[in-house]
């Protein structure tokens, strides 16, 4: 059992109907949902949830000029009754047109650009290295003749990878235990796009048509016929929602 964040997408809804609209969208995924003949199959995902985000870094940025709009969403208390203090210019949700996704992405884009520059500068002094995937595929095809331990040794034995892992400064440019060549793959623009796509989506997404997508699993797109990077999909989906549709962040327990 664990807690995680969910982004819920709703059709245009008046302020007084938001709580009921969220509850209706969430109902099919309740662990206690009772399957009815001809109705949706049981697909439990949660046993409790609450609106969440606008009192910390998980909230949606909103321009100060729009903060008086009554359609913006902020739940004033936690489930235990504790009062929440809203972070200025951050909300739990609201109409897509009022949520400034780019304001949230901007610092991440700047940091990604600097990481890209530093990595490219670092790699200039080394011969090109081969991504770990190449060694892993060779091991997969001939495990007896080329075991995984050998694949790892050959990958980490490359001068660039050895130097990168020996440099505390360079190690900070990419997540631990990842292949820096894979992390910085593609063009500068593609790298920044991947990094900024992590900002707005949560691990779980409930779409306008009622599809719960769990981005933490490998086959996240099975129900909707999609594959590839979940965050790129979810970020584009949220970006392109109609401006009057609501986007609300929840925390749920499963």
For the regions a language model picked out, list residue spans one by one:
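Charged, low-complexity surface segments at secondary-structure and domain boundaries
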Residues: 4-13, 96-100, 121, 213-224
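Low-complexity, serine/threonine/proline-enriched polar segments
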Residues: 37-201
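Generic structural signal of hydrophobic/aromatic residues within well-ordered alpha-helices
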Residues: 18, 22-26, 135, 139, ...
